[in-house]
Amino acid sequence: MKDGKENSNATFGSFTTNLDHTKPCWYWDKKDLAHTPSQSDLDPATEARYRREGARFIFDVGTRLGLHYDTLATGITYFHRFYMFHSFKQFPRYVTGACCLFLAGKVEETPKKCKDIIKTARSLLNDVQFAQFGDDPKEEVMVLERILLQTIKFDLQVEHPYQFLLRYAKQLKGDKNKVQKLVQMAWTFVNDSLCTMLSLQWEPEIIAVAVMYLAGRLCKFDIQEWTSKQSSRRWWEQFVQDVPVELLEDICHQILDLYSQGKQPIPQQPPMQDKEKPPPPPAAPPGQSGAQNPPAQPPSKKNSPQASPPAKIKRQHVSPKDEPKAPAEQVGSKIPRLESPMPPLPVSQPPERKTPSAIPAPPAEAEPAAASELDPAQGPAPPLPHGAPPPLPHRPPPTEFGGPCSDFLSSVKHKRRYLDDDRNL
């Protein structure tokens, strides 16, 4: 034991001199965990986040590769032990995580090729994160493996709370369904505890008892009967000795704090408020002085004129007098305007003859020319139904194209004569 202490002092410098060497090799107090080389040039919150991200990275990569839970827990334990002596600035967390998983696979007899681990890591990380592996990722992992082995002093065998949890659960009595539910929840807490530094503070037996205590409180399962040591005051005293309730509650709080830290960076209310603000801007660009006056009714009808903005501008000039009746008239007046965009349409629409009467100049020029050409062919034309397009062109044909147009008009005359004869019959 003394030789191991001397080697650690010679290898890792003054940091190990500040640790309590009376404890086992891989367990420290909280005061020692607050001053580690991993926190150099980092605040405690960032250092804790790096540890969580590295542990989750190992868990995700190992899960995709189909590795056993013992292999994942061993790799995460190597990860935490490595950063008790090194800095995150000097050794990137994702490269270290891949190296720890690679070594843990060989130790737990579930080896995976380094290229497979790197390939899986590439699928999980973005370009910035994967840039930590450098130009030759495999060489980075292989070189770091030697540093990892020297850091953990070739102490490769690691025990985990899983086996103790299953062993202790068999000693409990009661409803089997409740006991099974308790074990399942406690198993989940063990997985989550790997993202914390509990494996650097307490033995796996104590962590197993703590997660059972927490699961029993949450499941409302009071553990009162057990198979051995009925003389014990508390149920966990048959498994571990001299463990007060305060210690178990402290471990439980460290696990629960992990969930609270994960919920803080997920605010969902601000994005919902931002989504409610975009609807007003689309109405602002086409909105004019007259469009802002009726705020209650236009919202449902502002979306329809967006497809035809010129028609909306014309509608504003046609009916500026009666604003309350504008929404009812817009629906009927837009249909013929979309079908025939020619200017002299008000002549063939009886309901809109009142509006062009106020402006006699434009229709006066188009009416005599159209009447001179249509009177000999049609005579007095009956009023067309509202919304139906006129059968003939609105403007008179030019003189230079008189030949073809005259033939067309003569054919129309003959067709109408035949129709009149059929009606008389």
UniProtKB/Swiss-Prot annotation:
Biased composition (Pro residues): 379-399
Annotated compartments: Nucleus
Pfam family, one: Cyclin_N
Protein's UniProt keywords contain ATP-binding: no
Disruption-associated phenotype: Morpholino knockdown of the protein causes unconsumed yolk sac, small eyes, deformed head, reduced lower jaw size and curly spinal cord at low morpholino doses. High morpholino doses lead to embryonic lethality.
Gene Ontology molecular function, alphabetical: cyclin-dependent protein serine/threonine kinase activator activity
Composition-biased stretches (Low complexity): 366-377
SMART domains associated with the record: CYCLIN, Cyclin_C
GO cellular component: cyclin/CDK positive transcription elongation factor complex; nucleus
GO biological process: cell division; central nervous system development; positive regulation of DNA-templated transcription, elongation; positive regulation of transcription by RNA polymerase II
Region of interest (Disordered), residue spans: 262-425
Membrane-traversing stretches: none
Keyword Thylakoid among record annotations: no
Keywords: Cell cycle, Cell division, Cyclin, Mitosis, Nucleus, Transcription, Transcription regulation
UniProt family annotation: Belongs to the cyclin family.
Function: Regulatory subunit of cyclin-dependent kinases that mediates activation of target kinases. Plays a role in transcriptional regulation via its role in regulating the phosphorylation of the C-terminal domain (CTD) of the large subunit of RNA polymerase II (POLR2A).
Full protein name: Cyclin-K
Organism: Danio rerio
Lineage of source species: Eukaryota, Metazoa, Chordata, Craniata, Vertebrata
